[in-house]
């Protein structure tokens, strides 16, 4: 006799939409209020009042640092340099490979040269997380300058995280408003619950693989245009538009062809991304000192036209794309900047998964041919 349970087709959750697979104490996304908190703190408050180093500490330890910040910063600054073998590896990579391929390869190499790669105690994973956090800016800056035919600039131990990275990229520390806007972008991108790349990292961790493999998987997921690659696509679109006057017609063409408009909409937020107002203010401030009114006008016109036509609001990638462009970052480097930020959230989730692990192994509903004979 067939039971009701056996005869009912299972409910399929494409993309795991709406499925709650685990608990986390790291961040909370509330779609109804479009809010995001890190360890209980609203992200916009953290972006306004904290350094990226403080936020990294918060994500890893659960509390903002007080006296601990000095030692934390000292350890981070002491871990920034890359050795000659890493320098040689970066120099050998093809000039035409995507910068995300460079970052992915570099993280794999860090694991390959780590004699304790498979040691996964909480202390070991924290040390590896801090090392990746510290060295990724050096890797990204080295690759940016390599592609421009410029000599790498070594890290400066007397500069904070944001100042040091910008100095390694451009040979000087830019205007304070640019430094602060960049740091705010790092805070806003740092963590976002069980997004695709974070979930990829947790899946790999659930198999008891090493932290480098988990981060490499996350980088691969983030490279996709529907995830981290969107900030690059936003700026390419703005360059294609060219001027605010052309934005409505450009948008009409996109929508009539049923093409996705990058930088708008969100899988979780349906009524606006709470991170956008903070980053838009940062964009406006950078535009003032970097002669960026043209891009700000395109931003405002496209935002208004998109909302009027679809009622869809922008996500964080929309203001971040032109902000990074005005900071003089090459467009292809935008997603590696995302990696520099999200390494904090990824590794926090990796450590959380490892501390209370269960192998992630969902089911599927077969939709192919029924069983058949070879004869």
UniProtKB/Swiss-Prot annotation:
UniProt keyword list: Allosteric enzyme, Transferase, Tricarboxylic acid cycle
GO MF entry, a single one: citrate (Si)-synthase activity
GO biological process, one term: tricarboxylic acid cycle
One of the Pfam families matching this protein, by short name: Citrate_synt
Top EC class for this record: transferase
Activity modulation notes: Allosterically inhibited by NADH.
EC numbers: 2.3.3.16
Catalytic activity of the protein: oxaloacetate + acetyl-CoA + H2O = citrate + CoA + H(+)
Pathway of action: Carbohydrate metabolism; tricarboxylic acid cycle; isocitrate from oxaloacetate: step 1/2
Keyword hit for Nucleus: no
One GO cellular component, as annotated: cytosol
Origin superkingdom: Bacteria
Active site: 266, 317
Subunit structure as annotated in this protein's UniProt entry: Homohexamer.
PANTHER family: CITRATE SYNTHASE, CITRATE SYNTHASE, PEROXISOMAL
Further information: Citrate synthase is found in nearly all cells capable of oxidative metabolism.
Family the UniProt entry places it in: Belongs to the citrate synthase family.
The protein's name in its UniProt record: Citrate synthase
Organism taxonomic ancestry: Bacteria, Bacillati, Actinomycetota, Actinomycetes, Mycobacteriales
